[in-house]
Amino acid sequence: MEARDVLKRPVITEKSSAAMAEDKYTFDVDTRANKTQVKIAVEEIFDVKVDNVNIINYKPKKKRMGRYQGYTNKKRVAIVKLKEGSIDLFN
């Protein structure tokens, strides 16, 4: 899996914005990606050193539309802590 396939998009929420002050950045990642692949992708794309990676798996939720029932897509989020430096997400 290539680096651009691993990272989908940065997650910009109130909680993740507060974590950026501690050099922790949050990304939506591919559901098949592991911690090592996420670390290599962030280091390659943003040219920074990664300290550690935490991954959160979100299960699909049951949703209804009238009498029809289905599920939302499952999601995987990675929280990446940097050793030094920062990522400029707003350019």
UniProtKB/Swiss-Prot annotation:
This is Large ribosomal subunit protein uL23. It holds the Pfam family Ribosomal_L23. Part of the 50S ribosomal subunit. Contacts protein L29, and trigger factor when it is bound to the ribosome. One of its GO terms (molecular function) is structural constituent of ribosome. Transmembrane segments: none annotated. The lineage of its organism: Bacteria, Bacillati, Bacillota, Bacilli, Bacillales. One of the early assembly proteins it binds 23S rRNA. One of the proteins that surrounds the polypeptide exit tunnel on the outside of the ribosome. Forms the main docking site for trigger factor binding to the ribosome. The keyword Transmembrane does not apply. It comes from Staphylococcus saprophyticus subsp. saprophyticus (strain ATCC 15305 / DSM 20229 / NCIMB 8711 / NCTC 7292 / S-41). One of its GO terms (biological process) is translation. The keyword Heme does not apply.
